[in-house]
């Protein structure tokens, strides 16, 4: 980890030193650092709104944008997504310098103005899928592999909700013991999905206690190519045979992806 980033993390830990204000969720030489900050910001009618901000600092941060996830019991998911998008816009002006504290201060000062903007809304009306099949320069595709799902019904509903809230399309695919999640959408939203997947208590352990997902791997990530199918919705599908799963990938223009990454899971 670069020294400026270490210094920034130490400073953040000193600033957010109150009970439960600061928590490091993971550190990795390859994936960077993920941490959570709990703060409050002024919302409607001057009322304080509690905010949970999860930041992912990749190894090449601050030369690249951090991953950001925003949650609040007093905001809708659509509002949280809008707040996150505004933060990322602000982050672009701070590239190449430590920015997390600046971003936290900015959202504390500007949350009320963001929520008052008509396009922010007060419900989930923005969380809809585009039916366009034209090439979108901002469209990316990610393939994830899960080791298992113990609380399958709850887990599936959670994945469906995240995909809907973040306007992601694709497939949650089951074949025997193989579990794959194929996601298409805005790259920043894909990053936020991964943060949610890794930091939320989405499953249960062997004793039935709620736990975070620790056995997920990113098999593939790339910008959507011309030959790739545009998924119009997020669907959960089960396959009884490998050739059925293969056909799904081939229909989506992902034959090479299947051969390189999925077949290896079967062997």
Swiss-Prot record:
Q: Pfam families this protein is in?
A: RWD
Tell whether Methyltransferase is among the UniProt keywords.
no
Q: Which InterPro entries match?
A: RWD_dom, RWDD3, UBQ-conjugating_enzyme/RWD
Q: Which SMART domains match?
A: RWD
- For this chain's UniProt record, which GO biological process terms are given? negative regulation of NF-kappaB transcription factor activity; positive regulation of hypoxia-inducible factor-1alpha signaling pathway; positive regulation of protein sumoylation
List, alphabetically, the GO terms of the cellular component aspect: cytoplasm; nucleus
List UniProt keywords, sorted A-Z: Cytoplasm, Nucleus
Q: Residue ranges of the RWD domain?
A: 7-114
Q: Which residues form a coiled coil?
A: none
Question: Where is it localised?
Answer: Nucleus; Cytoplasm
- Residues of the signal sequence? none
Q: Which PROSITE patterns match?
A: RWD
Comment, domains:
The RWD domain is required for the sumoylation enhancement activity.
Query: Quaternary form?
Result: Interacts with UBE2I/UBC9, NFKBIA, HIF1A and NCOA2.
Q: What does this protein do?
A: Enhancer of SUMO conjugation. Via its interaction with UBE2I/UBC9, increases SUMO conjugation to proteins by promoting the: binding of E1 and E2 enzymes, thioester linkage between SUMO and UBE2I/UBC9 and transfer of SUMO to specific target proteins which include HIF1A, PIAS, NFKBIA, NR3C1 and TOP1. Positively regulates the NF-kappa-B signaling pathway by enhancing the sumoylation of NF-kappa-B inhibitor alpha (NFKBIA), promoting its stabilization which consequently leads to an increased inhibition of NF-kappa-B transcriptional activity.
Q: What is this protein called?
A: RWD domain-containing protein 3
Instruction: Provide the organism lineage as a comma list.
Output: Eukaryota, Metazoa, Chordata, Craniata, Vertebrata
Gene name, Swiss-Prot/TrEMBL? RWDD3
């Amino acid at each position: 980890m670069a020294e400026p980033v270490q210094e920034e993390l130490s400073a953040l830990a000193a600033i957010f030193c109150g009970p439960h204000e600061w928590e490091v969720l993971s550190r990795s030489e390859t994936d960077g650092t993920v941490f959570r900050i709990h703060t409050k910001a002024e919302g409607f009618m001057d009322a304080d709104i509690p905010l949970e901000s999860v930041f992912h600092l990749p190894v090449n941060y601050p030369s690249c944008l951090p991953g950001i996830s925003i949650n609040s019991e007093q905001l809708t998911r659509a509002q949280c997504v809008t707040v996150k998008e505004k933060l990322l816009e602000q982050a672009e002006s701070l590239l190449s310098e430590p920015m997390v504290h600046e971003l936290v201060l900015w959202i504390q000062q500007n949350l009320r103005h963001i929520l008052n903007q008509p396009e922010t809304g007060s419900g989930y009306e923005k969380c809809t899928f585009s039916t366009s099949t034209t090439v979108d320069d901002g469209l990316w595709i990610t393939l994830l592999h899960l080791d298992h799902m113990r609380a399958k019904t709850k887990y599936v509903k959670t994945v469906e909700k995240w995909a809907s809230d973040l306007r992601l399309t694709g497939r949650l695919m089951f074949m025997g013991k193989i579990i794959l999640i194929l996601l298409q959408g805005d790259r920043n939203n894909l990053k936020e999905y991964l943060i949610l997947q890794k930091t939320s208590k989405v499953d249960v352990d062997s004793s039935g206690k709620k736990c975070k997902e620790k056995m997920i791997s990113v098999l593939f990530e790339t910008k959507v190519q011309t030959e790739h199918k545009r998924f119009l919705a997020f669907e959960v599908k089960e396959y009884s045979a490998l050739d059925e799963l293969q056909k799904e990938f081939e229909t989506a223009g992902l034959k090479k992806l299947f051969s390189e990454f999925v077949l290896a899971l079967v062997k």
